[in-house]
């Protein structure tokens, strides 16, 4: 009924915002790792 529709919408929104946050976290980790690798390559410390 109406309740399950609302609950479904809320869950979907939570899931989407959760995935966005996870994506941001993962993205930041990838960026940081990339910067670390680039930095050690420039210094020749890899």
Swiss-Prot record:
Question: TM spans, by residue?
Answer: none
Where's it found, cell-wise? Secreted
Q: What does the UniProt keyword field contain?
A: Amphibian defense peptide, Antibiotic, Antimicrobial, Cytolysis, Disulfide bond, Hemolysis, Secreted
What cellular component GO annotations does this protein have? extracellular region
Quick one: where is this thing mainly located?
secreted
The cysteines joined by S-S bonds are 40-46
Tissue specificity statement from the Swiss-Prot or TrEMBL entry = Expressed by the skin glands.
Q: Which Pfam families does the UniProt entry name for this protein? A: Antimicrobial_2
Q: Name one GO biological process term.
A: defense response to bacterium
**What family classification does the UniProt entry report for this protein?**
Belongs to the frog skin active peptide (FSAP) family. Esculentin subfamily.
The function of this protein is: Antimicrobial peptide. Stimulates insulin secretion by BRIN-BD11 cells in vitro. Shows hemolytic activity.
Protein's UniProt name: Esculentin-1a/b
User: Which organism's genome codes for this protein?
Assistant: Pelophylax ridibundus
């Amino acid at each position: 009924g109406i309740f399950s529709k609302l609950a479904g919408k809320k869950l979907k929104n939570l899931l989407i915002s959760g995935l966005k946050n996870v994506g941001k976290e993962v993205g930041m980790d990838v960026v940081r790792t990339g910067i670390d690798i680039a930095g050690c390559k420039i210094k020749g410390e890899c």
